[in-house]
């Protein structure tokens, strides 16, 4: 069995990658990839020729997507999505489920991820331990899964001539898991081991403190790694409860990408995935709204780190409620991260910050807006003051230009086209967007990005950032904090409420 990667595009490690990544977002396959980190690009200012080419590029990308992405909804509500890519004789078969941290009450905190670990265990068709793994090996398949905030995915990549067998293998795991107590006991220790490894990172405490303050009563619905005690006491009955509510065909999609024929895939899906439609899981258990931040908050976390990391976070738009703002958020983030932008010149080129990154993570149930950066203890106070000054100017008429925006739109369009080249990665990407925003959002993404104007970006920052409550966090070593006598009073824009691991 391939090495399992932990879930969720973890907020935990996102903190580190955001702070240490390069500053300009290069061509990104989607907002999903751009939101988890940045690829260095060093783009130049947009020329008139490039600006005029943008609409044609956007149109070509949408046209290409419509040619290679095929869809059908089965009678039981399962959406089947097929992506043709005949470059190599391989196919990826993936099931995506609208589950993840966002469905978790405190009593189930971390069990969406626990369920992911149990998916490839015994089921009614393969009841013996390791039978699933053995059959997958016979098919020449590699398989894995991941749990994020608003989607869980499971996939096999295998020779295209084993497509039907791979679909049957995933169907039985989806429909009829056994949750054997012996397997659950073993896999629980694996998940606890993942928890221990993450907890040992200096960034774990920092991100966890930020998450508690940003999400407040919704914390369990953003905490994919979960609660140790909930994981330790997991039972087969809790696994079955998750299956009953969320693992129903009308809450799942089947994505097949690679060297396949769409009509053959649809016929196989109709034959194999015939389980009855289930109840709407969100009709019986609706997801509560994330509570608004009542005021600014701040925290200082002491850990053995060699630099100073700063994070500012706001509650951003929900894609289902304010989709237009999500397009503006992505363009705005790209423009701010572009080398040569006003933001980068005043903060990084000035020497106050080693790096600063602006980020919006698209989610249906409130996506976070994050500005993260790295500086030195000696420059921290001045760096924070400079960052505050720039944030206050985000909606100034001359803070960014249409020319700066055009280059970033073009890079997004090119990145989407390039993403089609790798079938397995594209399947994962489609699964994320299907669950979080709907496939129609993804299909129209490049067009909507291309239509954004400076006024729309300014409206976004006024609605969600400038003058809005935020959470500010500083990660610093105990020695550096003592040396510079850092207190929450130094985070001057925040209403001082707490300090983790040190004195006020």
Task: Describe the residue ranges of each PLM region.
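An aromatic/glycine/proline-enriched structural segment found at the starts
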Residues: 41-47, 216-217, 224, 248-249, ...
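C-terminal regions of mature proteins
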Residues: 35-60, 253-255, 372-374, 404-504
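Mature N-terminal segment immediately following signal peptide/propeptide cleavage
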Residues: 57-96
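M16/insulysin-pitrilysin zinc metalloprotease superfamily fold
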Residues: 121-126, 157-188, 339, 360-419, ...
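M16/MPP (pitrilysin/insulinase) zinc-metallopeptidase core fold and M16-derived inactive scaffolds
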Residues: 92-157, 200, 221-224, 337-353, ...
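Scaffold signal of the M16-like zinc-metallopeptidase fold and its non-catalytic homologs
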Residues: 44-54, 166, 173, 198-248, ...
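Short acidic/His-enriched helical or mixed secondary-structure segments at domain edges of catalytic enzymes
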Residues: 137, 190-209, 288-308, 342, ...
